[in-house]
């Protein structure tokens, strides 16, 4: 199944954040899932991992590039995101990227941030029950 993974899920996995890492691992390591991220998430992950260290930053980028299909963050996606009515433009870009990639779901811990999304958002727990 094609799913776009929100950055919070990737960080749960990479940082082994309890109690969320277990569900993240089940989703990210399931070969039945085709994983997508928006291109801007790669640089954001690098930035956020600075608190852990330089090696972790590189490992995060390598993990994403190896395990995910990157949805280009082009003018079409950025323009589409502006029309979605999201309070947070970055979340709108994620939703527009999921739509462009024809993903079935966005997997996130912040489901309410995607209330206006053209692609349904599920929490990891919800996704694991389908």
Language-model-derived ranges and their functions:
Residues 50-55, 64, 68-71:
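Helix-adjacent hinge/juxtasegments
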Residues 5, 36-37, 72, 108:
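Short beta-strand scaffold positions
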Residues 10, 42, 78, 114, ...:
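A generic structural signal for short hydrophobic patches within well-formed alpha-helices
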Residues 14, 85, 118:
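Short, flexible helix/strand-to-coil boundary loops that buttress conserved ligand/catalytic motifs
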Residues 1-36, 51-59, 130:
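Short, well-structured N-terminal submotif of metal-dependent ribonuclease cores
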Residues 69-111:
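Active-site neighborhoods of divalent-metal-dependent phosphate/nucleic-acid chemistry enzymes
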Residues 2, 67, 100-130:
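Acidic, PIN/NYN-like endoribonuclease modules and their adjacent C-terminal/linker elements
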């Amino acid at each position: 199944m094609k799913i776009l993974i929100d950055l919070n899920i990737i960080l749960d996995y990479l940082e082994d954040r309890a109690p969320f890492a277990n569900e993240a691992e089940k989703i990210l390591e399931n070969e039945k899932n085709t994983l997508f991220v928006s291109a801007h998430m790669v640089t954001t992950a690098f930035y956020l991992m600075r608190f852990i260290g330089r090696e972790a930053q590189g490992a995060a980028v390598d993990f994403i590039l190896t395990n995910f299909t990157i949805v280009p963050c082009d003018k079409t996606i950025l323009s589409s995101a502006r029309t979605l009515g999201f309070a947070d433009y970055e979340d709108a870009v994620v939703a527009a990227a999921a739509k462009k990639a024809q993903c079935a779901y966005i997997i996130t811990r912040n489901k309410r941030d995607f209330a206006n999304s053209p692609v349904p958002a599920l929490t990891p727990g919800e996704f694991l029950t389908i």
